[in-house]
Every structure is written in structure tokens, then in C-alpha cells.
């Protein structure tokens, strides 16, 4: 089992799929990382040699991933809330930010229904 960016990658999966278990790396970026590192994306993670893992580690290290990315996103949201702009207010109230209707939908963002008391 390879460990990259503090994440244990699943050994039985292809490299490009396994890299997606790292927060901040999706399909496109995982394929790009494999290509630049010179690793076949369809190789299973258990079959990687140590130099290949090191090359992947170095390539993933060029991106902001995992805790650093989560922290950056949190800081950006906090900044919006401190500014008091529209998006910040919507974050503060737990409502959708991008103009979706809220009269009937938006249950994911608003959470479970609250009982109406009479």
C-alpha cells in the first residue's frame, strides 16, 4: 500500500483511480500526474516500484491537497463571511449561494425540516 500526501492509496486499484482518494485530486489531475510522472495510469498501485511512487509523490507535492486545501477553502469562506457580502451572508445562514430557489428545494443546504409549532 503506497502512502502519498498522508493518504494510504488502495493497493488493488489502478493508479489514476487510487490518486483520486487524495482530497484535491480528481480525474483530470490524477491522469495528468501519472502522465508527467511517467507512470502508466492503468498500473495497479501494488505493482508500483519505489522510484515510481517517489515520482508520483513529487508530482502530487506540486499541488495544494488534503489539509492545506481544506484550510485554504475554510479561510476563503470565513473571509466572505467577515466581509458581509451576499455570498458570505448565504454561508452564514446556511442557504444556497448561487441563485437556486429556496421556497421548495435546497434541503441539502438547509438541513432536515424543522417542525412547525402552533
UniProtKB/Swiss-Prot annotation:
It holds the Pfam family Ribosomal_S13. GO terms for biological process: translation. Belongs to the universal ribosomal protein uS13 family. Located at the top of the head of the 30S subunit, it contacts several helices of the 16S rRNA. In the 70S ribosome it contacts the 23S rRNA (bridge B1a) and protein L5 of the 50S subunit (bridge B1b), connecting the 2 subunits; these bridges are implicated in subunit movement. Contacts the tRNAs in the A and P-sites. One of its GO terms (cellular component) is cytosol. Keywords: Ribonucleoprotein, Ribosomal protein, RNA-binding, rRNA-binding, tRNA-binding. The keyword rRNA-binding applies. The keyword tRNA-binding applies. It comes from Stenotrophomonas maltophilia (strain R551-3). Part of the 30S ribosomal subunit. Forms a loose heterodimer with protein S19. Forms two bridges to the 50S subunit in the 70S ribosome. GO terms for molecular function: rRNA binding; structural constituent of ribosome; tRNA binding. The gene is rpsM. This is Small ribosomal subunit protein uS13.
Amino acid at each position: 500500500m503506497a502512502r502519498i500526501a498522508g493518504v494510504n492509496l488502495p493497493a488493488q486499484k489502478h493508479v489514476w483511480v487510487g490518486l483520486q482518494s487524495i482530497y484535491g485530486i480528481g480525474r483530470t489531475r490524477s491522469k495528468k500526474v501519472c502522465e508527467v510522472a511517467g507512470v502508466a495510469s492503468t498500473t495497479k498501485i501494488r505493482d508500483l516500484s519505489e522510484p515510481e511512487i517517489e515520482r508520483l509523490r513529487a508530482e502530487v507535492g506540486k499541488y495544494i491537497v488534503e489539509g492545506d486545501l481544506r484550510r485554504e477553502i475554510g479561510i476563503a469562506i470565513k473571509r466572505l463571511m467577515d466581509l458581509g457580502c451576499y455570498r458570505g451572508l448565504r454561508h452564514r445562514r446556511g442557504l444556497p449561494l448561487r441563485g437556486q430557489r429556496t421556497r421548495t428545494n435546497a434541503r441539502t443546504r438547509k438541513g432536515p425540516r424543522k417542525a412547525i409549532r402552533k
